[in-house]
Amino acid sequence: WRAEYYKRRAQAIQNRIDHDLYKGSLVKRGSGTLVMTGNNSYTGGTTVEDGGLFGFSESFGSGTVNVNGGVFGILSSFDDNFTQKGLLNSLVGVARAPMQKANVVVNNGGTYAIVADQNVQVGSLTFNPGSHVAVISLTGNAFEKAYRGEDQVGTVTADSVKGFNENALVTPDYALVNHTVTLDGNTLTGVLSKGDKTLADYAANSNGVSVAKALSADPALLGALADATKDEVRKTLSSLANDIHVTANAMTVANGQSLARAIKDQAMGIDGAARVSDVDGGRARLWVSGLSNWSKMDRSGASKLKSDFYTGLIGLEADINANNKVGVFFGAGKTKFKGGHDGKIDSNDLHFGIYGQSKFEPVRLDYGFAYTHQDRDTNSSVFFKDQIFRASPSYNAKVAQIFGEAAYTGLNFGSVSIEPYAGLAWMHLSTDDFSNDIGGVKVSTKFESQNLAVSSLGARVKVPFEVGPAKLKAVADVNWTQYMGDTRGKAKLQSGALNAKIRSEKLSAVAAVGVGLEAQLSKRAALGVSYYGAYGGKIKSNGVGATFKLAF
C-alpha cells in the first residue's frame, strides 16, 4: 500500500506542475542581503520585511513585490563573485521576446533603492504613505567617487509611477554626499554628489576634530565612511574621541592629592599635634585610616566622568625625638570611573609610602613620598559607522608624588589656634599603552606621561572642648590649590595612517573646605573623623575619612 500511496502522490505533484497549479512566493526576512539574478516564473508574489533584496526585474515572477520593511532594488547588472559566475546582465530591454517586469508597491516602513550607475526598468511602481526612497551603491565606490566630485546617477523607468511626490521620503541623510531623487514623467533619477561638509563638521569637541582630521587623511578609512549617515559619523567620531581614559588620569592626580592630605592629617592629627602630646605612653603608634572620595570632572561634549575612590590605609610611625617623627604606610582600595554610555573603568589600587614631621617652633614641617599603582579594567564600546565593537582593555597606571607643607603654629587666641600653611607637591603619572581590535583592525592608545606641580595656601582653625570626661577638638580648614604643568591627560589614537590626539579637560584652581572632629578615647587611643570638599571650574569632589590611632 505504501508503494501505491507514493505513486499516487507523485502523480498528483506532476499534475500540479503540468497544469501550472503551483504559485510559489518569496518572503525576505532577516537582516542579510539576498541578490536574485534568475528569470523566475513564480506567481505568488514577493514580500520584503527586513534586510535587503535586490535582483533583475525578471527575477521576481509575475506577482507583486510588496516592500513592507527593509530595502528593495532592481539591478541591470551584477558581478557575481559569490558563485563565481562573473558579470550577469538583466534580460529586460535586451531580449527580443518581451520579458516580465517587476511590479513594486512600497509600503509604510519600506525603502525602494535606486542603485547608482544602473538604469533599470520596472512595471508599476507605487509609493504608499510612509514609504522611503534612497540612492545606494552595492559596491560602495559610488559614494567615494561622489565625495571626490564625480556625480553618480541611477535611474528607474516604470510603466507607471504613483504616489512618489505625495508619499515618498528621500532617506537616509548622508553625511558627506548630497542625495537627491527626482521624478520626470515615469522615470525616477537618483543622484549622489559631493556635499559641502567634512567629517570635522560633525565633531562635538576638539578631540572629535582631531579624530576627524586623522580619518580624513587615511583614504581607506575615509572611503569606508563615504556612505555613512550624519548620525553614524557623529557616533563614530564621539566613540573614537572618547576621553574617558585621559580624564581618568586627570582624576587620579586629584585623588592622589586626597591620599597625601589623609597622610598629612593623620601625621599631625586633624586637631594638630594633640595625638602626640595627649596619647601617653610609647613613642610608636599604629594607625588605620579609611578614606572615601566622590568626584565629578567635566568632559568636552560629553557627560561628566564620575570617580568613586575608596582606600583603606594602615601605618606605623615612631618618634625620633621630641620634635621629629617618621612613619610608613600601606593601603589598598578601589577606584570606579563611570562615564555613562562611554563606558566605565574599574581599578584595583595599591598604595605605599613614607612620611615625616619636624617642628621648628613656631613652624611645623610635614613631608613624604607616596606611590599608587592602579590595575584598570575597562568596559566600553566603539562605534564605526553602523557597527559596534566591544572594547575592554586592561592596563596599569602609576602615580608617584613627593609632598611637603610648612605651617605656622604661633597664632593662638586663648584655646583657639589659627594655623596658616603653604604646601607644594610634585607628581608624576604614567600609564601603560593598550590596543583594541576593531573589526580586525588594531587601534592603539598611547598615553603621554604627566608631570605636575601642585601648590596650596590655606589656614586651619582648631578649637578644643570637653563633653563630660571626653576630650575633643574641632578643626576647620580652608585652602586654595593650584595645579601646574601637565594638567591635562593626553593620549594618541593610532592605527595605520590614523594618528589623533585625545585630551582631557584641564585641572586648574580648586577651592576647598574641610571640617574634622577628634576624640581622645583613652590614654593610648584616639579617633578622628573628617569631611573635605573641593570645588573647581572643571572638577568637584567630596570626601569623608576616619582614622584610629593606638600608641604602644
Language-model-detected regions and their locations in the chain:
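Acidic/polar low-complexity surface segments
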Residues: 1-19, 23-25, 74-94, 384-386, ...
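Outer-membrane translocation/initiation segment of Type V secreted surface proteins
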Residues: 1-15, 22, 138-312
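Extracellular repeat-rich scaffold modules on cell surfaces
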Residues: 1-67, 190, 208
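Extracellular beta-strand/loop-rich repeat segments of large surface/secreted proteins
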Residues: 58-154, 158-160
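Outer membrane beta-barrel translocator domains of Type V secretion systems
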Residues: 222-413, 528-532, 536-539, 543, ...
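Solvent-exposed, glycine/polar-rich loop segments of beta-barrel outer-membrane systems
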Residues: 237, 300-307, 340-343, 375-396, ...
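Outer membrane beta-barrel transmembrane domains
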Residues: 326, 353, 357, 412, ...
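Solvent-exposed flexible segments
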Residues: 406, 410, 418, 423-429
